[in-house]
Amino acid sequence: MSNVVAFLSNKLTLRGTEVAIFDYADYNEKLLGNKSIIITRDYEKIKNEYDVDIQAYNKFQSRFKVCYYQNQEDIDTIVSDNNISHIFIIKAGALDGVISTRCKNIIHCVFTTCQPHGQVYTPIGQSINNLQGTSYPVMPHIVTLPNCDDDLRNELNIPQNPVIFGRYGGKESFDISFVHDAIKSILEVRNDCYFIFMNTNVFYEHKNIIYLPGTSDMIYKRKFINTCDALLHARDRGETFGLTCGEFAICEKPVITYGQSRENEHLLILKEKAVIYNSFDDLFSILKTFTKNKYDMTNNGYMFYNPENVMNIFKNICLI
């Protein structure tokens, strides 16, 4: 018998959290034969909150029934009105009052497992368990992209030969200052490389640095990855899953990343496939000596997280 499963995020953004929610909801229908409903807060009421993006709202509304809440009572009403059997709530992990009293609650923890609640309490990565000293079953994200061979080099007026390092994610999460310095320095000694940054706060202007707005278009995102020769990842706190790292990795693009982050799920997944720097000098050397096809990304750990494998975990952990 099929279930009606609601997926709740308190706002819809262009970040990995909402990419993950969309994929869970999509494949809950396509692979598990259930019905998916999205629950979030109304764009018009929260449009000035950080990261809220109308593109994300439009994307979800074009695919799913979307219901809006303001408080816990609203959530219960939506659950009753739609005969929802399970509600999958992605949140930091703390007990925050966002829950339903009328169905099974799956609490999907992005940062902490310190306040268990709901019928299922599950982190997005083992690194959260490691940091918190817990042992909850892990519900990882799906890593998938549409098939597309096109890139953006012509559109961005970049020749075919230069090496291109790229990055997307939260606007503020490219935040390691010595990485900014290394980019400035490498552009003084290599004129055959470009940096393209999507949804990234401007930190330096240069003719070989291109800033692009964020997008919810996964085909455009695939073209962006196809344009790049590597991901340059520089989030000081690290990743509790690392969807951007995963999206580059399944396209066999090297992931150049900081090795000292507290949250290190991306390092646990990539293992020896990660291209790690710990200092300005490390990164400068990596960028200076980088050539296309230098690093082998075949059979890297993120390739496990395809829709079939992850939704099998979802069925066994979440749909109890």
Regions found by a protein language model. Give the residues of each.
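Short hydrophobic beta-strand element within catalytic cores of glycosyltransferases
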Residues: 254-259
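Acidic donor-binding loop of glycosyltransferase active sites
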Residues: 84, 223-240, 253
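A short, glycine/small-residue-rich beta-strand->loop->alpha-helix junction that serves as a flexible
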Residues: 8-23, 46, 172-177
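Conserved donor-binding/catalytic core segment of Leloir-type glycosyltransferases
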Residues: 6, 147, 158-174
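Nucleotide-activated donor-binding/catalytic signature segment of Leloir-type glycosyltransferases, i.e.
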Residues: 197-219, 223, 227
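Short alpha-helical segment that forms part of, or immediately flanks, the ligand-binding pocket
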Residues: 222, 245-250, 264-265
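A charged, aromatic-enriched C-terminal amphipathic alpha-helix characteristic of glycosyltransferases
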Residues: 278-281, 291-320
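Donor nucleotide-sugar binding/catalytic pocket of nucleotide-sugar-dependent glycosyltransferases
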Residues: 111-113, 118-149
